[in-house]
Amino acid sequence: MFAAENLRDWLGHTVIDPEGNKIGTLEAVYVDTTSDEPSFITVRIGMISRHRLAFVPVTGATVSPKAVRVQYAKKVVQDAPAIDTDGELAATAEPGVFAYYNLDYGSRSERRLARR
């Protein structure tokens, strides 16, 4: 495993938890608008007819030839804030994504996340 430096290269790959349990498929990368660095990924989870995209922080993520490993358990990701597969993250929902993972959102009025 090595650090996940360019997550865009891993779109469509399997995402696993620290124990190696498959969570889903890497769908998109969201960057912090102040640094343009990856901040969250979305992972396609759920049943075939009811897929959704769950947000997961990239801090501590690593990659191997077959998967991206995140630092959160499968159950935590399954319960995380999510959007429809064709949806967009509303600006009003951003603070909730950060709060779910106990991350500081700050008090800035502009958006913190942008899909790349």
Language model features with spans:
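Peripheral interaction segments used for macromolecular assembly
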Residues: 1-116
